From Swiss-Prot:
Region (Disordered): 1-103
The protein's name in its UniProt record: Non-histone chromosomal protein HMG-14B
SMART domains from the UniProt entry: HMG17 (SM00527)
Subcellular location, principal: nucleus
Organism of origin: Gallus gallus (Chicken)
Keywords linked to the UniProt accession: DNA-binding, Nucleus
GO biological process: chromatin organization
Stretches that traverse the bilayer: none
Pfam families, sorted: HMG14_17
Similarity-based family: Belongs to the HMGN family.
Miscellaneous notes: There are two HMG-14 proteins in chicken: HMG-14A the major component, and HMG-14B the minor component.
Record-level GO cellular component terms: chromatin; nucleus
GO molecular function: chromatin binding; nucleosomal DNA binding
Length: 103
């Protein structure tokens, strides 16, 4: 049979040892989540730099020719004598309201 501990035989309760010394307890406990957050932020920055460098480069070869042709087509007047209007024509109701306001 195992022997009993001396403190248990006295009827008293043992003191639980402190996990941290008084010197260490004066300092706040560091969070473990912070280093991970900084590491993720560093990855995001590197991805942003890659995206910026890719964005600065223009299309090459045939892609450039195609985009130039599309821009030229957009700038040309419409076929069959039709004209493109930037402004939409006013509706009848809107015209009537303007007439009433001007009176």
């Amino acid at each position: 049979m195992p022997k009993r501990k001396v403190a248990a035989s006295r009827g008293g309760r043992e003191e639980v040892p402190k996990r941290r010394s008084a010197r260490l307890s004066a300092k706040p406990v560091p969070d473990k989540a912070e280093p991970k957050a900084k590491a993720l932020a560093a990855k995001d920055k590197s991805e942003n730099k890659k995206a910026q460098s890719k964005g600065k480069k223009g299309p090459k070869g045939k892609q450039t020719e195609e985009t130039n042709q599309e821009q030229i087509k957009d700038n040309l007047p419409a076929e069959n004598g039709e004209t493109k209007s930037e402004e939409t024509p006013a509706s009848d109701a809107a015209v009537e309201k303007e007439e009433v306001k001007s009176e």
